[in-house]
Amino acid sequence: MLPTTRQFEAALQVLESLRAAGHEAYLAGGCARDLLLGREPKDYDVATSATPDAVLALFPRTFAVGAHFGVVLVADGYEEGYVVTEVATFRSDGAYSDGRHPDAVRYTTSAEEDVRRRDFTINGLLLDPEQLASLNAGPSTAPGAQPPHRRRPVVGDPGYAPDSAQDDSSVDVEQNLRSTVIDYVGGVADLEAGVVRAIGRPELRFAEDHLRMLRGVRFAARFGFELEAGTKFAIRALAPRINAVSRERVRDELTMMLTEGHARRAFELLDETGLLKEVLPEVAKMKGVGQPPQYHPEGDVWVHTLMLLEQLEPGCAMPLAWGALLHDVGKPPTFRVAERIRFDGHVEVGVAMGAEICRRFRFSNDETRQVLALVENHMRFADAGRMKASTLKRFFRLESFDQHLALHRMDCMAASRNLDHWNFVRERYEAMPEEVVRPKPLITGRELIAAGYTPGAGFKEMLRAAEDAQLEGTIATPEEALSLILERYPIM
């Protein structure tokens, strides 16, 4: 079934306008792939024979964001705001001397030439807008394109099962959309077979843009596909080149892998292709680091971490995802055997290592703080039952405490599966109102000055002592707070 979203309608209007002006135009790339998979595209891309100047002249609201590469954004106005469609001119690329961008591009009128410069066959499909308007038409094949392939069942067919019920990596391709496909590279067959295959010679595709190696892993994990053998071999051979890619681009790819709901498979593939030891050597070193079986019957630190990643839900918070990945990153360097396997100080070491990883990938200060807080506090749940009331309440004050709860639960489920500590903390956290966790201070520095104290560094300790007593429930009024401070810190 075709989407009914504003984005889709806007893309069709762009296509119709380009066609009416005498240009070729197709839905292309990820949106074509997702439509064939029965998924709702996040955005829509149009490939066209129209030059950027022609696109700019044809539409009243445009943004030439990538004119050097033939990319123009076309905005369609609605009362609720603008909907943007990316329009790219058919092109062929010159050499990629920087491993990221082509040194030169040449506009072309050939859709096939444009497709063959792209990364993977599943991203090299075009949808014909004229046939989208008459979905009952029979299948058609463009000159030089591959004919349609036999499909698997779709909604309404005998034997159909939704994606969540599929036990294998093959996928359904909607029959009505199948009739609109222009396929020069065998992308439909690879969609049906569940294969991520580079277009043409994989070593050339990855030499052009090294980030494509990570993208291939991400697509395979996202769709439950396999990397085609030649594509996987090329990634292994070229994996060290990923270090030439900007850390921000690598970070963004890794974050998508962690937050799309298929993190375990993504990191297994990163390991299998040799990319993991290049981008995250600290995580790669988890392999083979044993753990005490009485606490970790699941196996080594790597297996434990994979089991955490498997529990990350689609759309999970970025700090939680990275916290899950890095929570035990300090274990390999602190491994020792003294009667049993021990990791003394692994939390402190892990925080330092996590800080370096966040710096390397240029996380924001806020992101770094949240990720490191998860690493630093993930072992504290075991002590919660022995905490003083003031300590427990301060524990609950941690930013995004729900993420700390989520990480601890995943940690338990990836090990002994004992949720006693998690239940203890969760029950008390949910039962404790915010005003109890963060009560209004009974006394401030202004009152201390009024009482005769000289401002200085000692104020922090005094106010902390009063707050501790307040959180413990031993004092409840400003007068009691001042009396406690006067008793403990007499005015000299």
Enumerate the predicted regions with their spans.
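Catalytic cores of the polymerase beta-like nucleotidyltransferase superfamily
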Residues: 1-492
